[in-house]
Amino acid sequence: MQSTLSQSPGSRFSQYMALTKPRVTQLAVFCAVIGMFLATPGMVPWHVLIGGTIGIWLLAGAAFAINCLVEQKIDAMMRRTAWRPSARGEITTPQILLFSAVLGSAGAWTLYTFTNPLTMWLTIATFVGYAVVYTLLLKPMTPQNIVIGGASGAMPPALGWAAVTGAVPGDAWILVLIIFVWTPPHFWVLALYRRKDYENAGLPMLPVTHGEKFTRLHILLYTVILFAVTLMPFISGMSGVVYLASAVLLGAVFLAYAWKIYRDYSDELARKAFRYSIVYLSLLFAALLVDHYARPLLGV
C-alpha cells in the first residue's frame, strides 16, 4: 500500500473528497437549493444562497464521511465500494473523525451565521439521522432500512426552504415526501443487481431477506405511489401545468421501468432504472424551479 507520506497533495485531497460521496452530496444540495428558490417569489438573498449551499454541503459531507468510517469493513467486501479510501485503509479512523468534525463544525457555523438557527439545527438533525440512526442502527438491522432511514435523506428541500424563510411550511414537506417515496425504489433496483454484494457483506437489504420477486413487486408499488405523490405540488397550488406535464412524463418513464423490472427482470434493466431514477429526481426538481418562475409569466 502506498504510504501517506509518498502521496501528492492532489491525491490526498481526492481521497478526502471521496469520503463525502460527491455525487450523492451534489444531488442533495441541488434539491436543497431548489427548496430555497421555491420558498420565495423573487430572488434568494445572495448570502443565504451561498451560505446555505456551503453549509448544507459541509454537513452532508461530514455525515457521509462518518458513514464511510462505520462501513469501511462492509465496503471492503463489496465490489461497488471497495475502492473507497476508507475501505482500502488509506485514511485512518482518527483522520476521518477529524475530517468529519471539521466539516460538520464549519457547516454548522456557516448555517448559523448566514441563514438561521432553525436551518442549522434541522441540518444537524439530518446529520444524526443519517450518520447514526440509519448507518449504525437501521441499515445493519432491518430490510426496511431504506424506507425508515429515507427520512433523513429526504430533508434537503426543507433545509433549503428553512434557510430562506426560517420556517418549514406544508409545501416544503410535500417536497420532502417526494424524495422519501422516491428513495426505496431508487435503492432497491440497485440492491437487485448488487444482491450478492449485500449478501456477502451481511446487510439485510430487501432482495437478500425477501427475495427478488418480492422486491420487484415493491419497486412497482412504490413507483406507483411516487407517481401519485408527485402530483401533489400541482394539486396544492404550489406548481402549475409546466411542472405537472413534466411530472407526468418523467413518472410515466419511471413506471415503465418499474413494470418491466416486475415482469421481465434483468441486471442490465435494473442498472438502467437506477441511472434513470437519479436523472428523474434531478429533472423533476428542475421542473419545479422552471415552473416556479415561468408560471407568473405564462399565467398557468
Swiss-Prot record:
Molecular function via GO: protoheme IX farnesyltransferase activity
GO biological process: one example: heme O biosynthetic process
InterPro entries the UniProt entry points to: Protohaem_IX_farnesylTrfase, UbiA_prenyltransferase, UbiA_prenylTrfase_CS, UbiA_sf
Keyword annotations of the record: Cell inner membrane, Cell membrane, Heme biosynthesis, Membrane, Transferase, Transmembrane, Transmembrane helix
Parts of the chain that traverse the membrane: 24-44, 46-66, 94-114, 118-138, 146-166, 172-192, 224-244, 278-298
Lineage top rank: taxon: Bacteria
Membrane topology: Multi-pass membrane protein
UniProt-listed Enzyme Commission number(s): 2.5.1.141
First-level EC class: transferase
GO cellular component: plasma membrane
Note: Carbon 2 of the heme B porphyrin ring is defined according to the Fischer nomenclature.
Function: Converts heme B (protoheme IX) to heme O by substitution of the vinyl group on carbon 2 of heme B porphyrin ring with a hydroxyethyl farnesyl side group.
Family as reported in the entry's similarity comment: Belongs to the UbiA prenyltransferase family. Protoheme IX farnesyltransferase subfamily.
Name of the protein: Protoheme IX farnesyltransferase
Species whose genome carries this gene: Burkholderia ambifaria (strain MC40-6)
